[in-house]
Amino acid sequence: MKRRRIDVLCLQETRWMGCKAKEIGERIKLFYYGVETKTNGVAIAVAGTLKEHVLSVNRVSERLISVRIATNEGFWTVISVYAPQCGCPEADEMAFYDELDEAIKSTPESDYLLLLVTRDFNGHVGQDRKGFERVHGGRGFGIRNQDGERIVDMAEAQDLAIASTFFMKRKSQKVTYCSGGQKSEIDHILVRRNDLKTIKDVKDVKSIPGEVAGQHRPVVADMCIALPKKTKTNVEPRIRWWKMTKESQKILREKIVETGLPDPSGPIDSVWASAANITLKCARDTLGETVGGRRGDMAAWFWNENLQQVVKAKKNAYKIWQDTKSLAALNDYKSKKKAAKAAVAKAKNAALDEIYKKLDTSQAEKFVFLLAKARHRNSLDVTEVRTVKSGNGIVLKDPTEVKERWKQYFSHLLNQEFPRKERISARPVVGPVQPRSVEEVRKVMKKMKIGKAVGPDGVPVEAWKVLGESGLLWLTTFFNNITRSERIPDAWRDSVIVPVFKRKGDIMDCANYRGIKLTAHTMKVYERLLDSRLRDMVEIAADQFGFTPERSTIDAIFIARQVMEKYREKNKPCHIAFLDLEKAYDKLPRTLLWEVLRERGIPEYMVRTIQDMYGGSTTRVRTVHGTTSKFEIGVHQGSALSPFLFILTLDTVVKNLMEGPPFTLLYADDGALIANSKVELQDKIREWQMTLADAELRLNLKKTEIMSSIEEPGDVSDISGTMFTQTKEFQYLGSLLSADGTVGAAVRGRITCAWLKWRESTGILCDRRCSRVLKGKVYRTIVRPALLYGSECWPVSKTHERMLNTAEMRMLRWACGFTRCDRVRNEDIRTMMQTVPIQLKLLEQRLRWYGHVMRRPSHHLTRRALEMEVPGKRSRGAPKKRWTDAIYKDMKEVGVTTDDIQDRALWRSRTRTADPANMRDKR
């Protein structure tokens, strides 16, 4: 592509397996699709100047793939086609042409150009253009055959021009296939007839073996369309905090101490500005900073000048052989080809040896996961989008308009508030200011993670950790100064929003992006101090599991499954409404927040401090075209304090509606209401709807769904009469619940999720140079937790265990490079990967969770759900397997009783039979 200056290259019969993207060097990105049989296969390679403008990739089949690219004047759709060969069943040919017709018809008419590249169409369109003058130029090659008639008919029906027939060329520039003395033109380029004027030339060119199959010659088209201009993105230099070592930490600490931080008791704004400047200056001098701009091509890092000369000599030898056809030239080409191949392999292996040696060390664990993440990112079709849609659906391409659209979207999202009913304001609680202690700050600093993106001030938490005790003393005094003054530095009010695509929906729609907000790290430390104080002063209802210590998603999932299981056991109807609040975090009214804080008895000085933190907040949106201008926001979304303030507000608003577990379950803004009948459930939903509306919050009617274990007549509707969606399965907090209470759907869902995680990690798991021990570590840390999420709540059967074991063994065999035809035993595979059978891991997780539940007090919500009784009798016949049945069987297998539960060390030693995957398992 580089030699011919090709921007888009369509490939067929690639015979690669999988469907993803791949960086192949020289900033070229390859989008491909292939099946497990490694037959057929299509791909499209896009040059570096265009890959950033790819909007979507549509992989129809192993014979059809399309890419849509944004241009200056519109959009360009490229379709790569590999038609069925002679002898293929007629049904396959008909299915192929149906898919091709649908792909062409689905391309928007407004697209600037549709380029259809085909290979092995086996159709000779010939020179005769009679009856097809609009789509055939009369300058083809050979005589039209039956397959050629089909091509011309399709071109006529779709108004596509066969581009090569409109250009007068030599015979040698028309022939695209040559074998056994037979020459023909079977590869064609088709464009919309109205866009034929953009095609300036079409011809075939000589290829070099290794680039194209020997019998085929590539077809090249010169087109005149306005491609996107190369835009220069201003990238701000960054301090190399990630390069910090123990030695550089010592140097940085000495420089800051020598320079001296300002007195933390002085004016807040000037103190912080001075402290930030001193810290950043010392860090630049010690660690250095990046220069910004685009990184170079990292794929060909082993390519040196010597290799370039060897490969160039091989190409020259091939050209000489093609011109002379002499035996001496052929032998010379073969020897140079062999030498070039050996030289490339030697250079690449030598360069890779050091990297893989580093991967096998115990210190390289973080590097392994960074490498897997980077390789996964390179396999994504679209990594950045330069065009978005306006509120009216108009596509915006101008950088200024794109930035303005992002600003408009987030400004509306973070400032919109619904009308609400005023609450009776509580009297302010007056009390003395409680200063922060050094121990409180130290405890919070331990929870702060390093390596996170910094806010606009550029000061990360690493800077304070480097200073050690002196940094803690300075921060404690400064935070107490903020508390007394009841205001934060103005520099902390600014933030940056980074839009992240949710991987679903239209990629050009701003609503399909989640805004990640970057704020000052030091402010997050102060917010965590406030958060800990607030949690000590108020108590959150037992129904709320989100952002609360010692409560998790597994608690809520376990309670929901236990309730459904017990209702099923007694053959009683169980109706669940899964509630979702509409943009709850983004539209939380600030005035409601102050009223709630005073109502819950929070001291007024803390209320005023939080008010100041939320007042005058501004933000900017970071886009691929640069950062937008500042705009004010009403909701201080994304801070460390916001989650607790949200659940505190929701807890106060709906406190009179809480029935307690297991009939009301909340995880932040996701709720579940359980009732015995649809009428009762409808009354509950409407009551919640009215209460939330009074607090300026709304239910998302599209995402609120109803699930019933036993079908009953009638529907459930809201206040306005809108019917809620009835469902048989619902994804609750990541675990799939079924109306019949079984876990089969959940098992299948986790297997699907595990395969997604597997594909994200194939950069390591499918790398032949990585050791199997390293692959096993990656599998146990990334893939298996996704496979077994929520499994501690499953009463799995032998069938479910076989499903999980089959999925796991396929992954492990694939990682080892074996198939079942190699006849390698499962036990040997697990030994290589240091991974125990998944049945043991399931047993361990169930018993670990059972011990955790039973050690809790009897009034705890999980204990109450486990021990609750539903009135009625069990149905006749074989009873369904219960979770406790699986537990008693597990206990018998490992040799423990209920008397051993309170002895945590004994219980752990007896039940831990599987390999540890994470820190929780190792404890």
Predicted regions and their residues:
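Catalytic palm active-site di-aspartate
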Residues: 82, 216, 455, 494-497, ...
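Active-site palm subdomain of RNA-directed nucleic acid polymerases
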Residues: 107-115, 530-545, 643-674
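Catalytic palm subdomain of template-directed nucleic-acid polymerases
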Residues: 88-91, 126-144, 583-600, 671-695, ...
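Short, conserved micro-motifs composed of acidic
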Residues: 19-28, 167-184, 431, 697-728, ...
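A shared catalytic/ligand-binding motif for oxyanion handling
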Residues: 1-342, 349, 353, 357, ...
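Basic, alpha-helical interaction scaffolds
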Residues: 240-284, 309, 316, 721-794, ...
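Surface-exposed loop/turn segments and immediately adjacent short secondary-structure elements
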Residues: 9, 228, 232, 244, ...
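Conserved pre-catalytic core of RNA-dependent polymerases
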Residues: 82, 410, 427-644
